[in-house]
Amino acid sequence: MSSHTSAGSIYKQQDLKGMKVYPEHYVKILLLLGEKLVAQFDRFRVDYIMCGGTLLGAVRPPHKFIPGDYDLDFELLCTPGNRKRFFELVKHVRANPVGCGINCVLHLPTVVKFVPEMARELARRFGLNNPSIPNPTADVFITEPRRGGGHKIVGCQWPKWYYKAGEIFPLQTLAFSGLTWCAPNTPEKIFRRYYGKTWRIPEHYAWPTSSARTQ
């Protein structure tokens, strides 16, 4: 049996066990949010990589959004001038949310959360701001150099999520639900460190009890 079929079978088994699956139209909104955010990354020359469940979905067959996930995860790289360029992006988005199609909420020093920018009536039609379903968000985690090389997330509550020297560069691009985004050179190493040897087997984690609200 192929790994693609195996992963699909496991997802189906989890669905039968009551795993919450992110609604299809929420996934479409989320992917469009990610596409718009990455366009801003490119515009402002921001160096980034996928991380967390997004990177896991890109690496593990079928290379797409994990059904039980509920957001997108990116990390800001510690390259020269990158943090300055990123916050220029943040300033631009906050000043032009309608034109960018996205907005953001600062949870510094750790993360900036990007959300879709849409009229309240449109959000209502899409069923957003539902307390039982996390709204689509794209989290960009701020990083800092790590002693001995590599980087870690500022104020990170996940001590095993870090990169050693040589695990990030050279960057690669990976397909994720039909999109192509930047990824670290050796993602398997961080997965083994963070999730353990069974990282290829899908596992469901509970959704948060609250979500960022869209406008």
Where are these regions (language model features)?
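A solvent-exposed, acidic/Ser-Thr-rich amphipathic alpha-helical stretch
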Residues: 86
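A structural signal for short, well-ordered beta-strand segments
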Residues: 53, 74, 138-140
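Conserved catalytic core of two-metal-ion nucleotidyltransferases
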Residues: 19-42, 90-184, 188-193, 202-215
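Solvent-exposed residues in well-ordered beta-strands and their adjoining turns
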Residues: 77-79, 143
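Juxtamembrane luminal stem/stalk of type II transmembrane Golgi/ER carbohydrate-processing enzymes
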Residues: 1-21
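Tryptophan-centric aromatic hotspots in well-structured domains and transmembrane helices
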Residues: 48-49, 53-54, 66-68, 169, ...
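Short, well-structured secondary-structure segments
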Residues: 6-9, 26-29, 46-57, 200-203
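Active-site nucleotide-donor binding segment shared across nucleotidyl transfer reactions
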Residues: 38-72, 79-83
